């Protein structure tokens, strides 16, 4: 039997040193953004019962879930998303809360992916949920929060594409078509495959009204600015479809009034495999990442599976993809703290320790040297990115070496503190 003790499973990744610091910094920024936007953070368990995710509107197929068993033989899963656990928490622990609830989270989720497809099996997901209100104000709040979050992280040249789940549903609800064919139709539209769509519709055209046929045929082309809404309205008299178009238009106009319309585009060909979303849906894209970095929308039917009927909307950000985009855009902002290494003669250990503690209180990264040899100390400091080496070698002034300028000085403690605070 092969020994895998030196490897990690497909789709997993070790995150080391600077990359780890950057990721934690992004997560910290996200938490602050949500906090100052009025959202309260919640934490759910990594392991849930499979039944939590086993519903006919679940957005994650069961074959994408990591499964295991507890000691009673019950099926468990590593959570494949965060929205469903929040639905469970809301339905079971927040029935008496004041609504609307504004919740946020940052956590790892787990999804089984095919080998060699380049996708991660463990993803850090961060997002918000607005629960208990079904007006467009909450949809606008969710989308605007998404835009401001990406801007606050320093991301450039991104777009939020708006669609409406009810639009496609309205066009196909009276259509006599097998489930597998409907799924195929959705996939063709999502991929904007005009040739395949025309061929597919020609084969079943007798099941459509002429209007619906023309509109569905044009769905892959109906993306762009707000003018797309009027173009789509001219192609249908379907009342439900028209209402969906009005909802997108009204949401767009609210975002325009705020002054963030430059980040919005419309995509009426945004359809979903499973009827998870019930209203406006949106995805965030940036050139540097091939897949969406953010997705969200209205999901009014989820929480009822946990004992209470509540409308909800929200979004989730893929933190790992955000890191990739920020790195490629060279806009990764991170405050660089000064780093200090203190070496000492044994009789000055207490003084060295006390000074290290003083520097830490001033938010300076500081450590005592575990090495005694001068050359080893210098080599370690350079590889570790240390800015200053400080030596406690006598009672008076301290040895200070600036590794950037390579200058050496002998200074008093207060002079060193002033130097480090520059």
From Swiss-Prot:
**What is one process in the GO biological process aspect for this record?**
L-histidine biosynthetic process
The gene designation is: hisZ
**Cross-referenced InterPro entries:** aa-tRNA-synth_II, aa-tRNA-synth_II/BPL/LPL, HisRS-like_core, HisRS/HisZ, HisZ
Leftover remarks:
This function is generally fulfilled by the C-terminal part of HisG, which is missing in some bacteria such as this one.
List GO molecular-function terms, semicolon-separated: catalytic activity, acting on a protein; histidine-tRNA ligase activity; transferase activity
- What biological function has been recorded for the protein in this entry? Required for the first step of histidine biosynthesis. May allow the feedback regulation of ATP phosphoribosyltransferase activity by histidine.
Chief localization: cytoplasm
Similarity comment: family membership: Belongs to the class-II aminoacyl-tRNA synthetase family. HisZ subfamily.
Subunit record text: Heteromultimer composed of HisG and HisZ subunits.
Pfam families given in the database record: tRNA-synt_His (PF13393)
> Per the UniProt entry, what species is this protein from, by scientific name?
Clostridium botulinum (strain Langeland / NCTC 10281 / Type F)
> Cellular location of this protein?
Cytoplasm
- The record lists its disulfide bonds as none
Which protein, by its recorded name, is this? ATP phosphoribosyltransferase regulatory subunit
A single GO CC term for this protein reads: cytoplasm
């Amino acid at each position: 039997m092969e020994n895998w003790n030196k490897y990690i499973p497909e789709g997993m990744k070790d995150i080391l040193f600077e990359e780890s610091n950057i990721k934690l910094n992004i997560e910290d920024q996200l938490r602050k953004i949500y906090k100052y936007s009025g959202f309260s953070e919640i934490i759910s368990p990594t392991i849930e019962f499979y039944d939590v995710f086993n519903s006919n509107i679940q957005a994650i197929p069961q074959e994408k879930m990591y499964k295991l068993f507890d000691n009673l033989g019950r099926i468990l899963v590593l959570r494949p998303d965060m929205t469903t656990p929040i639905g469970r928490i809301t339905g079971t622990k927040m029935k008496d809360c004041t609504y609307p609830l504004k919740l946020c989270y940052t956590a790892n989720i787990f999804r089984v992916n095919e080998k060699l497809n380049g996708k991660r099996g463990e993803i850090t997901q961060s997002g918000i949920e607005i629960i208990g209100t079904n007006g467009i104000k909450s949809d606008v709040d969710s989308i605007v929060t998404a835009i401001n979050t990406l801007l606050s992280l320093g991301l450039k040249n991104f777009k939020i594409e708006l669609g409406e789940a009810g639009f496609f549903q309205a066009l196909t609800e009276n259509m006599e078509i097998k489930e597998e064919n409907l799924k195929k139709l959705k996939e063709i539209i999502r991929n904007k495959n005009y040739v395949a769509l025309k061929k597919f519709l020609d084969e079943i055209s007798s099941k459509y009204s002429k209007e619906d046929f023309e509109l569905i045929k044009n769905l892959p082309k109906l993306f762009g600015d707000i003018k797309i809404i009027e173009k789509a309205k001219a192609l249908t008299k379907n009342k439900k479809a028209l209402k969906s178009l009005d909802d997108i238009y009204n949401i767009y106009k609210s975002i325009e009034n705020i002054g963030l319309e430059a980040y919005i585009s419309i995509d009426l060909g945004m359809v979903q495999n499973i009827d998870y979303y019930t209203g406006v849906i949106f995805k965030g894209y940036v050139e540097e990442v091939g897949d969406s970095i953010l997705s969200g929308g209205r999901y009014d039917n989820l929480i009822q599976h946990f004992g209470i009927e509540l409308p909800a909307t929200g979004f989730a950000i893929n933190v790992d993809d955000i890191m990739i985009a920020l790195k490629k855009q060279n806009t990764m902002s991170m405050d660089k703290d000064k780093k200090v290494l203190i070496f000492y003669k044994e009789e000055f250990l207490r003084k060295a320790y006390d000074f290290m503690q003083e520097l830490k209180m001033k938010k300076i990264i500081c450590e005592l040297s575990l090495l005694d040899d001068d050359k080893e100390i210098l080599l370690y400091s350079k590889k570790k990115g240390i800015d200053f080496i400080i030596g406690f070698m006598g009672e008076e002034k301290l040895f200070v070496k600036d590794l950037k300028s390579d200058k050496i000085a002998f200074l008093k403690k207060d002079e060193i503190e002033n130097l480090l605070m520059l």
